[in-house]
Amino acid sequence: GFSLLSKAMVPKPDLTGQMSGRSVMTRDAAHSRKIVYGRAKIGGNVVYLESTGSGNKYLWLVVAVAGHEIDAYESVWFNDEKIWGSSQGYYNNWGNVVSISFYEGDQTAADSALVSASNSKWTADHKLLDTAYMVLKLEHDPEKFSSGLPNISTIIRGKKVLDPSDNSTAWSQNPALCIYDYLRDSKYGLSE
C-alpha cells in the first residue's frame, strides 16, 4: 500500500528510458494473467506463434498483455525502438513489414485475419475474452529483423477502476482508486 502512495508523490518517470529492460516478452500458452493498473510498459506473453505464406514469409504472434480490459495502447516497442505510437502510427517504415491489431479486452470475436491465415489452428473460438492482447504479423525482412525475433513490449493504460466519489468507471493512475479496485475485485483481488 505504501509503495503505491509513495509513487503518487514522485514526479512522473520517463517511461522510455527508465522502463526499458524491465519488460520481457515470454512464451507460455498457460501463463498467469497480469493485472495492470495505471500506465505501464508490459512485455506480454506470446500465447500463439505461427509462420505462414510461401517460404514462411510471415510470422504471426498473439501477445497477451493483461488478463482484463484495458483503457488503451499508447506505443509498441521492438527491443528499445518505438515502432508504433497511438497518435503517429508506424515509425521508420515499420508499417511496411509489421501490422498490428489491438484488442483491449472487450472483444467478442477472434482476430479475423489470423483465423483466415492459420489453416484452422487459430479459430473463431479463440476470442481471448477478458484479455487485452495484440496480434502481430511480421513480414520476413533480413534488414529489419537482423538479430531475429525482437523483444516486443507495449506501453498501455491499464485497468479501468471505479471512483466511488462520482460512481464512474474510467482509467486512473490514482493509487487509492487502484488499491480500492484490487481489494474489491472478486476475480483477481481480495474480495470473495
What label would you give each PLM region?
Residues 2-192:
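Polar, S/T/G-rich
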